[in-house]
Structures are given as C-alpha cells and as structure tokens.
C-alpha cells in the first residue's frame, strides 16, 4: 500500500499550476480545469482566500508578496525550492465509491477531511532557528502557518480510482518572533505524518458513516468500506506496480527499500499524464472493469446509502 501522506519538492514549478494541478492525471481538449482554493493562515496573511487564480500563485512561486510584489523571504532568486507538494490520498474503497460509484458526497467528505488534516498540519509549520546560540544549529521553531493551494484529483495515471489532494505550500512562513517571512521547513510536518494519517482516517470514516456507509477495520494503514472491499485489488494497478519494483529492489540490493527509496521508485516509474482522455471516458473504462453483477451491487450500495437519513 502506498503511503497516504507524502511530500515532494518543487524547485521551479513554472508550469506546475497549468500542467499538473489544474489537470487531473488525464486530460482532454475542452476538459474543465480542476479548481483549487487557498489554504492556511499564511495565505490569509497575504490576502489570499477563495479560488486559486494564476497571478498570486505565480507571485508565491517567485517569492513575491501577491499584493505588493515585494520579496517575501530574504533568499529571493537564490532560493531553490518554490513549493512543497503535500499529497493526501483516500483509502481505495473510498475512491471507488466517489468515482466508479459516482457518489459526489463521498468526494465532498474527503475534501472536508483533508481540510481538517491540513489545519492540524499547519500547526507543525516551522522555520530553522538562526538566532543566538542556535545560529548555526539545525533546530527548528514552530511558526504555525503556511500559504498553500489545495487541488483535488480523482485518478492515478493508470486510470485507477484514486481520490487524492495536492496541498501545494509556498516556501515561506511568517515568523512572528522575527517579524518577517522565512523559508518553510517541512520536517516537523512530515514527522507528524503518522498522527496526521490517523486524523484523516478518523475524520473520513466518521463522515462516511454519516452518509450511510459502513467503514470498518480502521488502523494505521486506512480502513475498509463494507460492500466495496472485494473491488479493491481490481483498481490497485499502480500499487501492484510499485510493490513489484520494491520487490525487484530487494532482490538486487539484498534489503528492503527505505521509505525515501520507495518514493523515488514511485516518482521515477510514474507514467506521463494521459492526453485526449476525458472524464466520461475514464469513468466508462473504470465501469468496464466490473462485471454486470458487480456494477449492480455497487450501484445498489450507493443508492441505499443515499436513501438513508443523515446520521449524527
């Protein structure tokens, strides 16, 4: 199973908004762009709320204040990291319900759960301590804010259902102690990822229960949804491919890959985004992987959940 919370470094990102974030992992001419929204106290501090637009995103990429155009952090053009892309993924059963099952309420529940997790994650935003005795240390100090943009995608590049979020964080955080913007240090946020995963799973399972589904087996790796679990392997082609690469690595190196090495395997083996494939075509391909009986069973499960009164 792939890690449900990962982070990647974006060093330039000049095309990242248009070519990656605004597009799903497939794309067709005329396809509606994926809409994003601003997140974080840092975003609000520079006047960013609501829908993501191009100009302020570009300002953050270039280390500029979106309203004034002034340089944010002192490193300016020398700063090699533009963004930190934090990715949060839903358990496979949830992705199947939201996409193949067509229950938009599940997609909304995932989005709401992600926002709760990101609010928790923001508490761990930090800067490197560079004052006094700590001037030359590698210690961090929490700032509790970041400026980011949130985008939701719903498929892997193998076209498996894979509901996931990109929280793209600008490499800047406001340090109240020094009254200025400094480079964002993600180490504490990543160190908190086991806790944050549990927050995501608990929030999402609770919301699914209120929608009429039966999540069960909550643990550190996720949870299952009754009536969907038998379809999980069918739509896990990407996970199987990564597991195969990890097994080959183990045979070659005589040891299992580290988490960082798995992330590299994932990145280097990732296929290009598919072009000339529309959302209806993707849904049709996914539905075609189900037998007639499986499709009827999934539709009945979704209809039953929709018919139930919301649960507190």
Model-predicted regions and their roles:
Residues 1-312:
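Intrinsically disordered, flexible peripheral segments
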